[in-house]
Each structure stands twice: as C-alpha cells, then as structure tokens.
Amino acid sequence: MQSSLFINFITFFILITIISVSAGPIKCPPINSTASNSTQKRYVVFLSNDKTHYKWLKECYNRTVQSIKTTKIPVDKNSILDISIKGKFYAYSTWYYPEFAKKYLSERPETILVEKDLRVKINQCPKKNESSTNLTVQTNPTFNLDRIDQANFPLNKKYIFPSSAGSNAIVYVVDTGVLVTHKEFEGRASFLGAFCVGCPDTDDNGHGSHVSGIVGGKTFGVAKKVKIVGVKALDSKGQGTNADIINALIFVLIDAMEKKNNAIINLSIGGQRSEALNKVIKLLTDNGIHVVVAAGNEASDACLTSPASELSAITVGATEVKTNDITNFSNFGKCLDIFAPGRNITSVGIQSNTSIATFSGTSQATPHVAGTVALIISKFGNQKPDEMIKTLVKFSTKNLISNTKGSPNNFLRIPPP
C-alpha cells in the first residue's frame, strides 16, 4: 500500500514539474530598436485567435487594449486598437519598430499577417468647379444619369428609374465625410463617425459629399430615396491610411450587423495593393455587405492596387461624356467588373447647403454603381454579394466599350422601372 502511494506521489510530482516547465515564463523579446535611425511604424496585424496575444503584449510591454466599439482612434502609440469580431475575425493596429515586427511578431504561432500601414487617397482628378446655386427640380437630368438608363447614345433627356428608388437600402460612404445638411439629401444622410486623428465630424474636403450626391441626391443621385451614412476616414486633403480605412470598415460591419440593414459600402479610394485591406473587404462581403470600389486613376492595371484588386468587391472603371471610350485616367484589367460615367460629373458641393460641384474620376464612376445596387435591392430584394455582381452584369450593356485593355466589356445600366 505504501509502495503504491509512493509511486502515485512520484507520478504527481513529475506531472507538476512537466506542466511548470512547459508553461514557463512568458518570453519577452526586445521590443525597442537598437538602431539609432529606426522609428516606429504603424502595423495592421491579423491573428488566428486572441487568447494569448494580448496577454503577451500587456505583460511584456504594458500595451493597453482598446476596442473599436468604444474607441475609433488610437489614444497613443502604446495602445492597441482591437478590431476583432468574436468568432469571425481577429485583428488590431498599433505601432512597432520594424525589427520587432519582422523578427518576433511575425513568428508567433497565432500571427497570420503583419502588414505595415499604407497610404490611400481619393480617386478623383484635382480640377474642380464649384458654385453656390438654389436648386430647383430639373426638367432634364445630368448627362450621366441620362446615360445609365439606356443602352447607347443618343441620350433622350430622361432618367427613368424604379419608383422604389433605393428606399430600403443604406449606403455607407467611407470617405472624407458627408455634408449631411445639404438640401440634396433631404434629411436622408447621417454621420457615423470619424476614424482619422484630428479629423472633424464633417466633410472638410468635399469628395465624400460629392460621391454621396451621386449615390442618392434628389437631383444628381441614382437612388433618390436611399439612406446615406457618412464615415470619415480621410483628411482634408483626401488622404489617409489603410489602418484607418480598415478600422472604419470594421465599425461599419458591426453597425450593419446590429441594425440588420441592406448595407452597401461605397469606397472611392485607392492605394498600393494590400492583403490586409483585401482581407477585410472579403470579410464584409462574406457577411452580406456589398462593397463597391473605384478602379483607380493611374491608367494602369487595377489588379496592382487595393481595394480594386479584391475580387469579391464590385470594381468600377470610368467612361467618357460623349463616347463609350474609357477615360484616359481610368485603371483597367481583369479585376474590373463594370464601367460607368466618370468624366465631368456634377453633384453636391460643400460651400453651402445648396452648392454644386463638378469632378472627374473613377471616384465618380463608383457611386453610380453603388446607387444601382440600392435600386436593385429596393426593387427585387437583397442578394448575396456574388449574386449582385451577376445581376449588375445581366442588366449591363455588353460589348459597347472600345479598347477595354483586358477589362470585362460591361457598361452600367440601371434596372427597368
């Protein structure tokens, strides 16, 4: 009996020793750089789970964790902005020295992706004309609206659209903000939040308001009854970072999931190809949100940029005013889905609540498609994002555009009334 107890005690002691040794102290590799010229960079980090990662950062480096649900902007470079959605997605953004990110962070077993933050900008040509005007109901629509309700030229000076007009859809415009008080929006526009440091809760650039007017303005909009939500992630120059865009997109996903609305995102921005940004857009479309993105204004392959290269998004190129030619600035290639008017588009300005402005760019082509998605939802009901792409292509005019440079030859056409 004593022998049996002694063996059991020895076995228990060995097990405790093994557990203690295997658990051991948390390893804390040096987080600061020894190089005199090294500076901290912002990174977006994707994880397989967050069970041990945040504990490691807190215990080793005293990093504080904030949730995107309560904090839209990082407090400082020592804070972690957690954008995880439990059971779906685990990620955060913060600042690290490049040596630490590459040598230690990337090698942790739960780390999926470590990407240095990249710059993004609006896809709008710089020249603009803006004036303050008291708008009245126009007898004739702007040329771009006239163009997308018919197969080809000549234009018939009418814009004929379904009477539901996007009424049960919502378009989140992730951009420079929206002048929600502009009369074009008729009280249908609201503001969700700002995600860039030092940015006010309004549009101090004009790009986001202009884009929103094309989506759903009473005079200049494709879907004249759609609800518009402004999400500010770009500054007064129309510039920003992938990390801020990603934070904004995750916040939109949370908002759309809570409200269970028929959500569409208009993303008239572009930058270098980013695996992190593309992954987030795929997360959005996997959760039923339609993401419409600009092809870009570099007159090059859209597959080299993001978000245009994400295949689950609806990528839009731009065409000319009086012809079916691609504009000389529009990106092109197999990553595109459809083309829409993008030259000399008149819409909302920000000088006053009645001002109008004229811009060009794939930024302007994109909201034509976002508005059309709203029309389809209000007329036929919502669809999965991959099915929506097929529906847009079905309604589009085929083989009309000259010199597509490897792009699908689809020109936007709204559904019939």
Where are these regions (language model features)?
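N-terminal domain-start motif of subtilase-like serine proteases
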Residues: I26-A35, Y96-K103, N129-V173, F195-D203, ...
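Acidic glycine-/aspartate-rich tracts in secreted/extracellular proteins
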Residues: D50-T52, P98, R119-V120, G177-V180, ...
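Autoinhibitory propeptides
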Residues: I31, K69-N144
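C-terminal subdomain of the subtilisin-like protease fold in secreted/lumenal serine endopeptidases
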Residues: V226-G230, I250, I254-L283, N287-I289, ...
